[in-house]
């Protein structure tokens, strides 16, 4: 699936929230940002959850691959990280049809960029409307 501008900013938000550290193994990737991935718990092909901050974590390439290869381990990690109830909410939301029009994507990108700027300036996640 092709990434768009919103995906790129969302990825930076997720990795910034994690302070450029893998949320699984704890390795730091501030000097090599490409090696830290924005890993979606539920596929980003579902627009309803694609940009939901609860649906993504920062994982190094090794941990991301490990979770891709072992979905059971990944599911257990997700439940430990965000809780079973939140995970079930995300799964239910992913099943809802959600179409985003071109002009809406532009507004989404604008909001995400504002949130990233605020996060980089040290604002709290609650202040910027970012759920973790």
Predicted regions and their residues:
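A detector for short metal-coordination/catalytic motifs
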Residues: 69-132
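Histidine-centered nuclease catalytic patch
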Residues: 23-57
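Conserved aromatic-histidine-acidic binding/catalytic patches
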Residues: 2, 6, 48, 66
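General structural signal for alpha-helix termini and helix-helix connectors
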Residues: 44-47, 62-65, 96
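Short, charged surface segments at domain edges that flank catalytic/cofactor-binding sites
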Residues: 1-21, 98-99
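Short Cys/His-centered divalent metal-binding micro-motifs
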Residues: 27-30, 56-83
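Extended interaction regions within the primary functional domain
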Residues: 9-10, 41, 60
